[in-house]
Amino acid sequence: AGGILRGTTRPEDLSCDQLSMTATHRTLGQTGYQPTDPPRVLVQLRADIPYLTRFVLLRQLADTVVSEAFFGINDDLESTATHTLQTTQRIIEILCEEGLSSNALSTLNKAREYHRELGIHDEHFRYAFLVLATSMVFWVQDFTDARCSSEDKLQLGLFFSQMANAAGIFGISSDIDTYQCQLDAYR
């Protein structure tokens, strides 16, 4: 019992604004959202926010990546691909800031390298998901044993599994086996 859940803000305690996702296909037309606008959830990711709250908001960012890749932003492939990668990079930067992954910075640099070398096309999404799934692996490895109760560990495992499956849809099957082995080690 306890774990990271003890003494922290519960997801149900968060305001609707904190839990709002701006970059979903359903919301884009209603809010006038533009690819250059940072997701509003980023504003909430401050160091003084309880750990579980930040975890919930990171999940919002990951959901944003999935939504953008499936539905696009204003039907503009270039803007969608660029913003998807930027959002993914921000997730990894947050992991670095939280000290949750010693490998996150190198992963972020790889994402930027892919962005420079590959240009904008469908393959771009595969690498965005690859980077996201990789960051989830490092994240789970770095704090599971130290911070998480069994219940929390299961929650993280399910989240990572969903991200890995999303990556698989975009054809990263050769990497998913490796990620699945990492996930199985924590079950």
Predicted regions and their residues:
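Mature, function-bearing regions of proteins
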Residues: 1-187
